[in-house]
Amino acid sequence: MDAQEAERAGLVSRVVPLERLMEEALGAALMICEFSHIAVMAAKESVNRSFEGTLNDGIMFERRMFHALFATQDQKEGMDAFVNKRKAVFTNT
């Protein structure tokens, strides 16, 4: 399977020319750095755990993470920023 086929199948979100690969990857990393670090860690752990256990186990884990994240200050900040159409300033708490 080549990159274009993987994109059509939904396995990758975007295909870029090799000469722009590092620029695009760094741009994605910078964007992720602007998110709540707590939420990014939870998302990464959810993806890593998706390879372990059953689909139901994964759904239950994601549900627990969702509820845990709802108790954070970053969740409140993110919602307030969204409602007030401003950029969120996360404190990672």
For the regions a protein language model found, what residue spans apply to each?
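C-terminal long alpha-helix characteristic of the crotonase
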Residues: 2, 9-60, 67, 73, ...
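Interdomain hinge/lid region at the active-site interface
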Residues: 71-75, 81
